């Protein structure tokens, strides 16, 4: 019985591995659920492959399966018949303990992120990242995310879609300040600060609650405040791809979780890197959460700083390092930066549930967390003004998404997705 099991597993692993090796040369990404779409027409699937190559691939699959099976086949033949253990309770307890211990490596550790394809990404050369991926895991991961999206969208003929979309593009007079040339400098340094769950309902200048974020209010008065700015989704992973890549969010899926797709997206950081910018991403949490690492490497980030770069004593919240510590780290990275121009992106986290922050200024936990991060923003900007890079640095503050506040707000209410984007140079 063991030998039958080993034979089946060996053949499946060999077929996936060899199939992946062949398909990668055509597709440029590791094997996923895509080949299964062609099972209904296998002749068409292999039409572009020469007959001799097809025969060679099948032969190599059997050879590789035999190599995998041979040691297990020999080992299984040497095991004796099963005997009931003398101490059944002790044996069961040991078996249960060993099975439970497997949960940690299967999950991928103790952090908020689970095992995902993006965890093995380590290089700015995508081919090396692909080489580190286990093809069997890649396929199984893809199958777990497979979903039929056809019923979630309405499709139109291109002509009708153009008619519907054209009015959304505006076309009226520009609302950009007439003296905008004073904001434009040649190859400025760029700081993109993404504020976790910040919402227009907490900003007075957007018609929200007064007194929550006085520092961002001040920055908005000194720079440019985009008041007609709305979040693309309600999740960070989808908001980030919208901010960096201009990719619209889908109802039940996140493109960040599909590295084979996200690697082909455009990106602000990718374009700036090609233009000679030094790029860096900072996040006080787990950079492997929702395949973030693979996405930011694909977007041209030269360096990623995350929770593992901070001592355990500073990881004080469920999500990681609080914002006052990470803002201080962000300031240090800018101060120590020797190469210009540079683009640095920073994702905050303290204003995420459960809103545990080292400050108690407001009674409401969400608003208090916003006020706390706002105070960190104020301290950071004041210190940054004293650095030489201040005069040639563009700072953009934007929320990844808003927050359901108050709790009874309806899903169709625009306040649910209204976010602000103050810009200062």
Regions found by a protein language model. Name each.
Residues 25, 93-98, 106-109, 148-156, ...:
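Short low-complexity stretches enriched in small and charged residues
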Residues 50, 84-89, 150-153, 157-160, ...:
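Alpha-helix capping and helix-coil boundary motifs
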Residues 166-420, 424:
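Solvent-exposed soluble domains appended to multi-pass membrane proteins
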Residues 43-49, 76-80, 158-162, 256-260, ...:
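Short, highly charged low-complexity linear segments
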Residues 39-43, 133-137, 158-161, 213, ...:
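Alpha-helix initiation and N-capping motif
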Residues 54-60, 159-164, 296:
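Long, well-ordered, tryptophan-enriched scaffold segments
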């Amino acid at each position: 019985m063991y030998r039958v099991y080993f034979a089946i597993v060996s053949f499946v692993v060999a077929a996936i591995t060899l199939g992946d090796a062949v398909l990668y040369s055509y597709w440029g990404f590791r094997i996923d659920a895509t080949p299964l779409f062609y099972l209904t027409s296998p002749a068409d699937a292999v039409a572009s492959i020469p007959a001799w190559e097809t025969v060679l691939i099948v032969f190599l699959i059997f050879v590789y399966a035999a190599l995998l099976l041979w040691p297990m086949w020999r080992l299984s033949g040497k095991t004796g018949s099963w005997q009931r253990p003398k101490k059944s309770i002790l044996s069961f307890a040991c078996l249960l303990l060993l099975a439970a211990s497997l949960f940690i490596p299967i999950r991928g550790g103790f952090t908020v992120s689970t095992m995902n394809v993006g965890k093995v990404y380590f290089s700015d050369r995508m081919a090396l990242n692909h080489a580190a991926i286990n093809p069997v895991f890649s396929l199984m991961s893809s199958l777990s995310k497979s979903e039929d999206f056809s019923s979630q969208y309405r499709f139109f003929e291109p002509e009708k879609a153009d008619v519907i979309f054209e009015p959304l593009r505006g076309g009226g007079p520009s609302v950009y300040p007439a003296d905008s040339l004073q904001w434009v400098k040649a190859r400025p340094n760029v700081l993109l600060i993404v504020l976790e769950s910040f919402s227009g309902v907490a900003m007075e200048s957007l018609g929200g609650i007064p007194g929550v974020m006085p520092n961002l209010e001040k920055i908005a008065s000194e720079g440019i405040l985009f008041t007609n700015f709305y979040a693309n989704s309600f999740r960070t992973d989808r908001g980030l791809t919208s901010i960096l890549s201009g990719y619209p969010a889908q109802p039940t899926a996140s493109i960040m979780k599909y590295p084979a797709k996200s690697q082909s997206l455009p990106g602000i950081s990718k374009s700036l890197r090609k233009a000679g910018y030094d790029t860096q991403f900072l996040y006080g949490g787990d950079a492997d959460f929702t395949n973030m690492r693979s996405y930011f490497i694909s977007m041209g980030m030269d360096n990623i700083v995350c929770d593992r770069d901070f001592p355990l004593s500073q990881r004080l919240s469920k999500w990681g390092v609080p914002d006052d510590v990470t803002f201080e780290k962000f300031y240090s990275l800018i101060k120590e930066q020797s190469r210009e121009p540079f683009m640095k992106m920073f994702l905050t986290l303290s204003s995420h549930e459960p809103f545990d922050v080292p400050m108690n200024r407001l009674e409401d936990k969400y608003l208090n967390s916003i006020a706390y991060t706002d105070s960190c923003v104020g301290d950071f900007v004041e210190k940054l003004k004293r650095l030489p890079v201040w005069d040639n640095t563009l700072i953009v503050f934007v929320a990844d998404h808003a927050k359901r506040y108050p709790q009874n707000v309806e899903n169709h209410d625009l306040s649910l997705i209204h976010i602000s984007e103050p810009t200062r140079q």
